[in-house]
Regions:
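N-terminal targeting leaders characterized by basic, low-complexity, disordered sequences
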Residues: 1-44
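Extracellular-facing binding/remodeling surfaces
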Residues: 53-56, 87-90, 144
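C-terminal region of N-terminal signal peptides and the immediate post-cleavage residues
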Residues: 70-87
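Glycine-rich loop/hinge motif
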Residues: 87-115, 183-189
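A short alpha->loop->secondary-structure connector
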Residues: 107-127, 138
């Protein structure tokens, strides 16, 4: 077991990516227009932070996943004066970081020595039906429900047992209160979970979670594209069957035809893009009461975002970040303790 309101402009691509996702799409033009270049109308405005912050975060998650398995071996002495020792069966302690995808968890399960296919086990389970939470018919897997925590599994530890433990933990943390809040926010529980999965991939500091959730709801209510690049990274990882894609997105990828491309499509992606923890679920269920539509990584380099209501405010915040990067020799600004 584990130990452990809001509103949306048409996208405008800029050659540079945001941190942890697109942080500030521009308002929609009255009618579609050609992009007109990196800063032209009709595409989502993004910032260079992506290559510094988002890719770094993705690489960090991958590194954590690679190192997250710890095997504990209980050693006991045999009777008598012999120095010989015998080893009890190892019990895998499997650590699932918040925001991991099922493909990343499958890699963790393999490295923990779990038997069987985690990917197959994470497709469906008699213990939980996504449809019960409002997921559409044909939802391909249990992404979003695979609760991140630390699990101690008794041998022989099949991968399916980890999935069972994760689903049981999810039910403990996503109950009637979250369902009630989803209803109050005019979304299904599955949509709330999807929003939580994006918050998990976007927020770098705890205090930003509820505000990022508010921006998502505010854009949804206005019919604006979310413009979150983390959804595009997820689409690429799914297509390639890889755990982590960390390269900077190119123009073709920014405009790729995918239901997960929240630059070119309005609404939510079809499924969660990660498996969120309690804090992000809480943020999605209780978004901050703020009017923000935009955010960009703050210029102080401490991981917080600068939030704004207007495109002009966003551009000023983005310019401040760009200036800080330039001042630091093209590198992300270093955080100075506050």
């Amino acid at each position: 077991m584990p130990t452990s309101q809001a509103a949306f402009p048409t996208p405008v691509p800029e050659a540079r990516q945001p941190a942890r996702a697109v942080e500030a799409p521009a308002p929609p033009p009255a009618a579609p227009a050609p992009s007109g270049g990196p800063r032209g109308p009709g595409a989502l405005r993004v910032r260079p932070r992506g290559r510094h912050s988002l890719r770094g975060r993705l690489a960090a998650v991958a590194a954590i996943a690679a190192a997250a398995v710890v095997i504990f071996v209980v050693v006991r002495s045999l009777e008598g004066s012999s120095h010989t020792k015998t080893f009890a069966p190892a019990v895998p302690r499997v650590v699932i970081p918040e925001g991991s995808t099922r493909l990343q968890i499958a890699q963790i399960a393999t490295r923990a020595g779990l038997t069987g296919s985690y990917r197959a086990a994470a497709k469906s389970s008699p213990l939980l039906s996504p449809a019960h939470y409002g997921a559409p018919r044909g939802t391909p897997d249990l992404e979003g429900f695979l609760f991140p925590a630390t699990y101690d599994l008794a041998p022989p530890s099949p991968a399916g047992r980890l999935v069972d433990e994760q689903l049981a933990a999810f039910k403990e943390h996503f109950g009637s209160e979250e369902v009630r809040r989803a209803r109050a926010l005019r979304v299904t529980p599955y949509e709330l979970l999807t929003i939580a999965s994006m918050v998990e991939r976007e927020a770098q500091v705890p205090g930003d979670r509820a505000k990022i959730a508010a921006v998502i709801y505010n854009r949804l209510h206005r019919g604006m594209p979310l413009g979150i690049d983390a959804t595009i990274y997820y689409a690429i990882e799914e297509r390639k069957g890889i755990t982590t894609y960390t390269k900077e997105l190119n123009e073709a990828q920014l405009h790729m035809d995918s239901p997960y491309n929240t630059r070119t499509r309005t609404g939510l992606p079809p499924t969660p893009i990660s498996n969120p923890g309690v804090a992000s679920i809480e943020a999605a269920a209780h978004p901050a009461h703020v009017p923000y539509l935009y955010y960009v990584v703050a210029a102080d380099g401490c991981g917080e975002h600068a939030f704004s209501r207007t495109l002009a405010e966003f551009e000023a915040n983005a310019a401040a970040y760009d200036a800080a990067v330039k001042k630091n020799g093209g590198h992300p600004p270093a955080c100075k303790s506050k």
